[in-house]
Amino acid sequence: MPEENIFLFVPNLIGYARIVFAIISFYFMPCCPFTASSFYLLSGLLDAFDGHAARALNQGTRFGAMLDMLTDRCATMCLLVNLALLYPRATLLFQLSMSLDVASHWLHLHSSVVRGSESHKMIDLSGNPVLRIYYTSRPALFTLCAGNELFYCLLYLFNFSEGPLVGSVGLFRMGLWITAPIALLKSIISVIHLVTAARNMAALDAADRAKKK
């Protein structure tokens, strides 16, 4: 039986398309906000499809999980870099957001791998109740991730326009009001990620040291 080419699995091909769309978005961000945001949101939307494809085709892989997470982190980070350029007074907040996002996911993934999980989304159900809901409820996970990305995307668009009026309020401004609490909640969950992962790593270190005594 011929060896399977993991790199050509359908979910991973979708992942490559996400990267291409994200790069196109970054290229247009300085000059063409609607083109840039369309490609950015398309890249994010495909994130939902690669997971469905992986489950439907039985093509879930460690490489695919890593590709998915890295694409998410890098795309968000690049958008935040652009936001820091557009809103220089808020640069520190964007820097903190980037640092928290990358650090929390990396440490959580690393602690999951060390503990023997195949993916950062496979958690011990006896662990933190907030993370348990976050990773076992697909609607909750989708709402928080999509709302967070939409908040930053709307903040980018808001720099250029308030959007079409809905009553007396611009659509982009209204969208920011709706998604801001979601983005804040996502940041709180990232802090929980970081603290929980740090405790897990410390517990593993303590167990290893106890074995050596």
From Swiss-Prot:
Any Gene Ontology CC annotation: endoplasmic reticulum membrane
GO molecular function: alcohol binding; carbohydrate binding; CDP-diacylglycerol-inositol 3-phosphatidyltransferase activity; diacylglycerol binding; manganese ion binding
BP terms from Gene Ontology: CDP-diacylglycerol metabolic process; phosphatidylinositol biosynthetic process
Transmembrane segments: 6-26, 28-48, 74-94, 96-116, 140-160, 175-195
Record membrane topology: Multi-pass membrane protein
Induction: Inhibited by PtdIns (product inhibition).
Residues given in the record as a CDP-1,2-diacyl-sn-glycerol binding sites: G51, R55, T61
Residue positions of the active site: D72
Cofactor note text: Catalytic activity is higher with Mg(2+). According to PubMed:7998949 the cofactor is Mn(2+), while Mg(2+) is much less effective.
EC number from the UniProt entry: 2.7.8.11
Superkingdom of origin: Eukaryota
Name recorded for this polypeptide: CDP-diacylglycerol--inositol 3-phosphatidyltransferase
